[in-house]
């Protein structure tokens, strides 16, 4: 997990602790602050253990936190590599912002089997989604948390047309309008839902996307 520290680091640690009960793991959490004055690279280890239910074994997870500032950020990939467990899949989670042009993301993503991002945290989701599409088919699998959060909506829409009486209406659709409301102004979910609907209907984009 690569974070800029602060609240994002705290949220990542909390998520890892809650995941441990279902998925024992070794989590490597990186607090990378390249714009801060140089300081020696520091690291520490902590354990996440859950109180087991009756008759169940206790499950614990291990978290290694690496703190890097300034030039020390360039040492992070070389520090992470020997900490990976052989023969286990490596999941690389970048929880905030658009990482694609950042050197740390490029180097760490080469070590991962799957990369997880959240396009809802990007200032320009259109650009973020285009870059995500460019990464598809690369050695690492790509997952967007916005796409995962859309799963109930996609299932509901698909179920609506499961009925034989409704299926003919699906292919008579000429126009779709998605109305969304988000206090933060994020529109990545709306864009992904539109893209999914268009791909299922075999539509192609004939114009340039413009924001009102």
Where are these regions (language model features)?
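Conserved, well-structured core segments that form the ligand-binding/active-site neighborhood
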Residues: 72-168
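Short, solvent-exposed polar/charged micro-motifs at secondary-structure junctions
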Residues: 38-43, 102, 127, 186-190, ...
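An N-terminal, globular interaction/scaffold subdomain
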Residues: 1-101
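ATP/pyrophosphate-binding catalytic subdomain of soluble kinases
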Residues: 150-210
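Short, surface-exposed, charge-dense and proline/glycine-enriched linear segments
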Residues: 59-65, 123-128, 202-205
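Conserved aromatic-histidine-acidic binding/catalytic patches
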Residues: 7, 71, 145, 181-185, ...
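Structural alpha-beta junctions
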Residues: 17-29, 84-90, 110-116, 135-140, ...
């Amino acid at each position: 997990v690569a974070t800029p520290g602060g609240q994002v680091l705290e949220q990542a640690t909390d998520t890892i602790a809650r995941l441990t009960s279902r998925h024992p793991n070794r989590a490597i959490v990186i607090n990378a602050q390249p714009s801060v004055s140089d300081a020696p690279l520091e690291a520490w280890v902590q354990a996440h253990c859950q109180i087991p239910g009756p008759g169940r074994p206790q499950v614990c997870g291990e978290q290694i936190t690496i703190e890097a500032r300034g030039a020390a950020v360039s040492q992070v990939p070389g520090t992470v590599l020997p900490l990976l467990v052989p023969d286990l899949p490596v999941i690389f989670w970048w929880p905030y912002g658009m990482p694609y042009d950042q050197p740390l993301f490029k180097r760490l993503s080469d070590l991962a089997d799957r990369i997880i991002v959240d396009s809802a945290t990007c200032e320009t989701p259109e650009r973020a989604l285009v870059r995500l599409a460019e990464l598809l088919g690369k050695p690492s699998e790509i997952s967007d948390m916005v796409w995962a959060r859309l799963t109930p909506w996609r299932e509901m829409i698909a179920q609506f047309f499961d009925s034989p009486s409704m299926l003919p209406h699906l292919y008579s659709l000429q126009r779709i309008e998605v109305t969304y409301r988000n206090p933060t102004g994020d529109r990545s979910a709306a864009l992904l839902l539109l893209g999914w609907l268009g791909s299922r209907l075999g539509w192609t984009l004939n114009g340039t996307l413009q924001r009102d």
